[in-house]
Amino acid sequence: MLSKMEINKRALKENMALLACPICGAAFEFREPQSFVCLEGHGFDIAKPGYVHLLKQAHKTKYDQALFESRKKVIASGFFEKLIERVTEIIAEKKKEQLVLYDAGCGEGSHLARVVSNLQATGVNVKAVGLDIAKEGVKQAARDYPGTSWTVADLANCPNQAETADVILNILSPSNYVEFKRLLKKDGFLLKVVPEANYLRELREFIYVDEKSSYSNESVTSRLAEKLSVEHVERVTYKAPIAKELFADFLEMTPLGWHIEADKKNELLENLPEELTVDLQIIIANRAHLL
């Protein structure tokens, strides 16, 4: 039986042609036992439990192991399941028998793993690459979801070859549209998920008493429309139950919870809502105007 390291190493080798040196952009070759070396001699080793660190230099982030453990618990509870089901349906509607799928801002990998599993269940052959600048998230993804190519990467300098992606997922994560345009195939598309006005309304109304109690994604969507051709927009809205024992994890994983004073957080934990509003916008965009 193969170890997680061996499974992930095999996946990275199989997807090597999709990757590019973050320093010079050259293609890689694999050198045993576990190194990617580009044509210019820049080398990157596969780290345990099976991910590759493809940054020019290390980056410090706010995202630590505790946050990603909390994120995994919340996602595993089914909180985002209706969103992921719809994301899968949209990709499956393209009727591709095989596709290359990048998750830009993959975190600890749960969303990508679920989408890949759903697509594979319909008979689609998926080559998947997860990218995130937070090493702790990527490390956890490699541990929990072996078989996908997990990379520590900067979305402003994606270590991937041009025109290789059929689909780029970008779920509640920052974007770099210049890089996304470079990575998309001519018939590929970006599937971006952003909050809508009522996302986590119950938390916002408790934490804020001013205009921050509501949210606008106008600046995000306007910027996207400037860079790519928007093909389709839809809204996914539902109420999701949240178990009391998961609420502390929820506050750990969402930026809304990072700025609550201790007294306010304790008050919230003593008066928990039974459900939270999930209100998200799915945007499908392509590079049609560039052709």
Model-derived features: where do they sit?
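Conserved SAM-binding strand-loop segment of SAM-dependent methyltransferases
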Residues: 146-158
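Conserved SAM-binding loop of SAM-dependent methyltransferases across substrates and taxa
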Residues: 108-123
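N-terminal auxiliary segments of SAM/dcSAM-dependent transferases
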Residues: 2-60
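Conserved Class I S-adenosyl-L-methionine
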Residues: 15-19, 236-291
